[in-house]
Amino acid sequence: MKNSMLQAAWDFVGIPFRLVLFDQKWLPYFGWTTLEEARCCAVRSYLKGRVLDIGAGTNSLINQYDNGVGVDIHEWGGGALVVEDTSRLPFADESFDTVTLIACLNHIPYRQAVLREARRLLRPSGRLIITMINPLLGNVGHAIWWYGEDKHRGGMKEGETGGMWSSEVLSLCRETGFRLRRHRRFVYGMNHLYVFEVSHKQ
């Protein structure tokens, strides 16, 4: 993705197509940045060491970063490890320096269990990175995104939500052993990026 003023201007012109009307697979043909690219770009500068990407989808982040592994419960291509349960992963304790959940925590019904698993897998100096959209935008988006991944797997399942409020994300992470270090917005303020560190409080 070209990170330039010209690219940013072209992406802005294309907002209706990029964010609503067009399948994300079409955007590169028009020179527009996909949501997946924007999310990966927002996350990349916070990655360190060996990375585990939970809910990796097409495994774009790991294929770009090239030091880690992506896992998902669905096969989307790209080389991610397909698992039955992302709260019980086949890795030893403290195997990773960074765990990411990019635009997917709201799609995991057993969120607390997955965050506890992330805590188990992180080294003491590790960090957890989450991106999220709020439920109002998310519910509208999932209703109109005819190309959304949930449509390809039969729709939203019980326990999934269109998005999560910041208060929910922060509360869940605090309860599972994380402390917030950074929170910022991206993609015109509609997406949230949270960077947590492992909390060592007993």
Each language-model region and where it sits:
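Acceptor-substrate binding/catalytic loop of class I
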Residues: 146, 150-167, 185
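Conserved class I S-adenosyl-L-methionine
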Residues: 129-151
